[in-house]
Amino acid sequence: MGRAKKVVLAYSGGVDTSVCIPYLKQEWGVEEVITLAADLGQGDELEPIREKALKSGASESLVADVKDSFVKDYAFGAIQANALYENRYPLGTALARPLIAKILVETAEKYGADAIAHGCTGKGNDQVRFDVSVTALNPNLKILAPAREWGMSREETIAYGEKFGIPSPVKKSSPYSIDKNLLGRSIEAGLLEDPSFEPPEEIYEMTKAIADTPNEPEYIKIGFHGGIPTTLNGIAKQPVELIEELNQLVGNHGVGRIDMIENRLVGIKSREIYESPAMLVLIQAHRDLESLTLTADVTHYKRGIEETYSQIVYNGLWYSPLKVALDAFIQKTQERVSGTVRVKLFKGNSTIVGRSSDSSLYTPDLATYGADDQFDHKAAEGFIYVWGLPTRIWSRQIKS
């Protein structure tokens, strides 16, 4: 008896998910495999991917265009939260997983499948993100993860697929693993597993090498409403359009590359290369606008929330009660985070050079050191006396 009768497989067209199709049927006795590819703006031609799934043995191959939802329901929330895992990674891949899990569950329920399958290995974070999200949305569905159990190396996986006529775009001599969507690219494996090895220029696609970037800076203006980016250079943009244009503008100046040693949820460290031009600049600009529009105590408290939020997303807990609670707090803080941020792009750097907002808490006649200064300097002495009182009492006590 097989492990499941009908399975919906998260499908990318890559090596692992393609090999999963014959493996599920031949090794695990699955009768029917339905593949589901999510169009997350990865730029691939999806019809060839759909055809590849059918040629690999899928009974049906589906494609879901979820780009708009990906940006509005996932990326924008992360921007409002200034979410950077370990203060560097803007979670482009991690944000896609709960959305993919959601449409997998919806498809399984529609087609009467009894299991969900994915091609994640046992060393990565994605297995956690998929499994936890699926069980949160429908705990009655089984989860099958062939790559977690089959024990094949990447080279052996490629060879297994070739036995069933599955071609691989990955060169056996340099097997980089690449994941791409609208928010960015992640590159790992191969020569990159040596943390001292400088990444070759050939791995990058969304960002130019510094030597190839323009010799003059470019200035852009990003407009926010309620913490959500809505305009670029004064022109209103649809969510997907905004991300696409920013990726092009920012990447053209070599901005958006990340090379980091990352702490994975499964307990190991991994060398990861990311390209995420739009998200990095949007978070940078959004955080700057918050400094203009939020009070000091809210700003400082929210910084701690942001770290927790990024860990929750990274660790696959998008549908957890804590995530829901943090969302409520973050949304409340964003009510007055509206305005425009001016960014200078030049030779791999993005620099905030100006910001403005109708909700600005910056008061020129209190901040100035000029003749228009309205700050009550005499009041400072009494404030300092009260502020420092606990410290003086403590000091007297330990010295007595």
Curated annotation (Swiss-Prot):
**Residues where ATP binds:** 10-18, 38, 119
Provide the protein name. Answer: Argininosuccinate synthase
The Swiss-Prot or TrEMBL record describes its family as follows: Belongs to the argininosuccinate synthase family. Type 1 subfamily.
GO terms, molecular function: argininosuccinate synthase activity; ATP binding
Residues at which L-citrulline binds: 89, 125, 129, 177, 186, 262, 274
Pathway(s) where this gene product acts:
Amino-acid biosynthesis; L-arginine biosynthesis; L-arginine from L-ornithine and carbamoyl phosphate: step 2/3
Q: Which UniProt keywords apply?
A: Amino-acid biosynthesis, Arginine biosynthesis, ATP-binding, Cytoplasm, Ligase, Nucleotide-binding
- Record's Gene Ontology CC terms? cytoplasm
A biological process from GO: urea cycle
The EC number(s) given in the record are 6.3.4.5
Residue numbers binding L-aspartate? 121, 125-126
Which compartment or compartments is the protein found in? Cytoplasm
Under the subunit heading, UniProt states:
Homotetramer.
Q: Which reaction does it catalyse?
A: L-citrulline + L-aspartate + ATP = 2-(N(omega)-L-arginino)succinate + AMP + diphosphate + H(+)
User: Taking the first listed entry, what is the main subcellular location of this protein, grouped into a coarse class?
Assistant: cytoplasm
* SUPFAM superfamilies given in the database record: Adenine nucleotide alpha hydrolases-like, Argininosuccinate synthetase, C-terminal domain
Q: What class of enzyme is it?
A: ligase
Question: What Pfam families does the record tag this protein with?
Answer: Arginosuc_syn_C, Arginosuc_synth
